[in-house]
């Protein structure tokens, strides 16, 4: 079965079985909602078990979650450093113009027919995502995912077409 990374358990939270998760999910509210099924992987990326979310809340930059049947710190402390993943079957359907991070990371970015670089990371600083584009011999380009900049995303061909607005590329 194919799994996709959605977060890392970085610590426990209190004594009642809550865990502090650093999310790398594209849809954290959906991914960590009550009843969601996730898979737990150890620090060697080996499958441990399926888990069900019974509670979720945001606190600062973390998602605080609790698993079904794990209601005390002693039951969850061993999971610090483990990774949470979602199975491909549990990903859900997307609307037009929505993409999973794993679909975007690695895509080639072009302006007209000139290769700019490849998407290496996606940041969520505020109102819109920012795609970090790794370029040959230049600093990374921060590309806001907004309509005037990102013209098209071709998932099957792993290609993004953009129009760089003035001031976006400080090395040109």
Curated annotation (Swiss-Prot):
Belongs to the RimM family. The keyword Chaperone applies. NCBIfam families: 16S_RimM. One of its GO terms (biological process) is ribosomal small subunit biogenesis. The PRC barrel domain binds ribosomal protein uS19. It comes from Streptococcus pyogenes serotype M18 (strain MGAS8232). PANTHER family: RIBOSOME MATURATION FACTOR RIMM. This is Ribosome maturation factor RimM. GO terms for cellular component: cytoplasm; ribosome. One of its GO terms (molecular function) is ribosome binding. The keyword Chaperone applies. It comes from the Bacteria.
């Amino acid at each position: 079965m194919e799994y996709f990374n959605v977060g890392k358990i970085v610590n426990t939270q209190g004594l009642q079985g809550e865990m502090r998760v650093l999310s790398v999910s594209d849809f954290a509210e959906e991914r960590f909602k009550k009843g969601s099924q996730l898979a737990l992987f150890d620090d060697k990326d080996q499958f441990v078990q399926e888990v069900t979310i019974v509670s979720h809340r945001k606190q600062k930059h973390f998602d605080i979650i609790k698993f079904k049947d794990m209601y005390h710190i002693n039951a969850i402390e061993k999971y610090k450093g483990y990774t949470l993943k979602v199975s491909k079957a549990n990903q859900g359907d997307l609307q037009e113009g929505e993409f999973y991070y794993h679909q975007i990371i690695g895509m080639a970015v072009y302006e007209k027919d000139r290769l700019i670089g490849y998407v290496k990371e996606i940041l969520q600083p505020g109102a819109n995502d920012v795609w970090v584009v790794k370029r040959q011999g230049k600093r990374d380009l921060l590309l806001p995912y907004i309509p005037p900049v990102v013209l098209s995303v071709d998932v099957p061909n792993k290609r993004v077409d953009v129009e760089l607005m003035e001031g976006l590329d400080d090395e040109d």
